[in-house]
Amino acid sequence: DRFGFQNSVMVNSGSSANLVMVAALKKYFGWEDGDEIIVCACGFATTIAPIVQNGLKPIFVDITWNDLNWNMDQVEEKISERTRAVFSSPVLGNAYDMDRIVDLCDRNDLKLISDNCDSLGSKYKGDYLTKHAIAASCSFYPAHHLCTIEGGMVSSNIKEVVDLARSFAWWGRGCYCVGQQNLLPNGVCGRRFDKWLEGYDDIVDHKYVFGQMGYNLKPLDLQGAVGSIQLLRFDEIHKLRRRNKKAIH
């Protein structure tokens, strides 16, 4: 909620977050194999890999040396009739020209996706870099802003996108309730046999309906417990990281 998103799902790594986020966006928006996503040439491998793994095509844009982010003039040049999204991945938390990229996306009907693994908490003109993103990922690897030993998260204000991401991370299961929201006092799911899955008229056991070709990317309870404590220290950690950057930059 702090970063402007109402829906999130935790997974076992930032790389997994990117994988299920791209899969969810492709399915939700109906992108086709071979559709293009513009990415920065300087970044981590698992920003790029999920694009290819989901049958899409990465289109690379070179960087500018002052911030290691994409050359905005090249972004304009790389747009084609098959471009569907721009996938930002701010290097070392350096803010990019958000005004220009948002204008570019609006003019060309493109979605802005944010790989926030390096930039959790980074701002541009007072706004978090994820403000205009249709979906965003973050990583809880030890070297990043928050640590859950390993872990990641997908966030979006489109509930269906997060539901799909959760399904892809939970084996592709059609039943993806959050936490204990539908549990009875005895711990049994109170809606397990209800008629609430789209496309299924008969009463079925939702636990064994798999609508996607999914994965097993669930986090451990321990990771969530560590993360809940780390959240309390986020401002402190962020302040220390900014201090360290100023010392070496």
Predicted features and spans:
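Phosphate-binding glycine-rich loop
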Residues: 1-36, 50-52, 60, 127
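Structured loop/turn residues at beta-strand edges in well-structured enzyme cores
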Residues: 3, 32, 81, 130-131, ...
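Conserved SAM-binding loop
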Residues: 10, 39, 154
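Glycine-rich phosphate-binding loop at the start of an alpha helix
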Residues: 11, 15, 45, 69, ...
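PLP-dependent aminotransferase-like
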Residues: 26-107, 111-116, 123
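Active-site region of PLP-dependent enzymes
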Residues: 119-125, 132-249
